[in-house]
Amino acid sequence: MAAGAAEAAVAAVEEVGSAGQFEELLRLKAKSLLVVHFWAPWAPQCAQMNEVMAELAKELPQVSFVKLEAEGVPEVSEKYEISSVPTFLFFKNSQKIDRLDGAHAPELTKKVQRHASSGSFLPSANEHLKEDLNLRLKKLTHAAPCMLFMKGTPQEPRCGFSKQMVEILHKHNIQFSSFDIFSDEEVRQGLKAYSSWPTYPQLYVSGELIGGLDIIKELEASEELDTICPKAPKLEERLKVLTNKASVMLFMKGNKQEAKCGFSKQILEILNSTGVEYETFDILEDEEVRQGLKAYSNWPTYPQLYVKGELVGGLDIVKELKENGELLPILRGEN
């Protein structure tokens, strides 16, 4: 009986192996909610989230659940800008309506239930959701001293106004973090009401709305922009500080809890086996550091391991040092 139930749960989560199959599924499931898990077999957190999906599939038979190996169908992953696993996309009427990055089972459950209900919540539930959203928006607007809510990313703006805003901030060497409103429809709509500002991009400093592109242009013209927004340290200075942040620093895809590529996962396992304390930096979260560190250390790939600010090397070198018995003395600063 238990085995049969497990098989039914697995069967409820379809697997997609090609771009053509994915497009066909979007058409076939257009009238229902489609939840797609972009996963990788090397990431244990993906296996856990597959189990969560299987449980949700049993509870919500009207929802279609699909898993797609991100590296196995790269054209689909690139189209939807999947840069890490696990990532979940939500579709209705063949259109993407929401996104969730990371292994967050409670958030996945909440999003699936909300989209599956299509506005059929009781008023009390709606009020509760509104309260949750406002709390989330407050956290997002305070996520960095200067936060830009835009269409796309600073590297790939997806509208002319967002592109101009990024250019102005870069021109004035302003340090900012960004949020892609296309990645989360709930935030996109909710922030308009939260700040009584109907358009994007929106710039916040210390959680307070400064304004959109026109306001920023006015502040630039009146030379007030430089006094309002925090300045970014020069990249080389920043990289020097980062590489010296801890005695042993690993620059990787992901973090200690969630490696987001096979090479990073392997180097974590090696470092963990030494018992030496180390810190990590997720290069997927900062494109400037990701590109700048390659030139700074003349090393083109990741992960990169540093001891006392000096580059040791990547995975292959760390493997060699371990085999030769040299890794531990280097990590301890004895060499």
Swiss-Prot record:
Function of the molecule: Together with BOLA2, acts as a cytosolic iron-sulfur (Fe-S) cluster assembly factor that facilitates [2Fe-2S] cluster insertion into a subset of cytosolic proteins. Acts as a critical negative regulator of cardiac hypertrophy and a positive inotropic regulator. Required for hemoglobin maturation. Does not possess any thyoredoxin activity since it lacks the conserved motif that is essential for catalytic activity.
Keyword Iron (UniProt): yes
Binding site for [2Fe-2S] cluster: C159, C261
Location in or out of the cell: Cytoplasm, Cytosol; Cytoplasm, Cell cortex; Cytoplasm, Myofibril, Sarcomere, Z line
Cellular component GO terms, alphabetical: cell cortex; cytoplasm; cytosol; dendrite; iron-sulfur cluster assembly complex; nucleus; Z disc
Any matching Pfam family: Glutaredoxin
GO molecular function terms attached to this record: identical protein binding; iron-sulfur cluster binding; metal ion binding; protein kinase C binding; RNA binding
Domain Thioredoxin: 2-117
CDD domains: GRX_PICOT_like, TRX_PICOT
Coiled-coil ranges from the UniProt annotation: none
Phenotypic consequence of C261S: Loss of 2Fe-2S-binding. Loss of 2Fe-2S-binding and interaction with BOLA2
Descriptive protein name: Glutaredoxin-3
Modification Phosphoserine occurs at: S117, S120
Domain observations: The thioredoxin domain lacks the two redox-active cysteines. This strongly suggests that it lacks thioredoxin activity.
Alphabetical list of SUPFAM superfamilies matching this protein: Thioredoxin-like
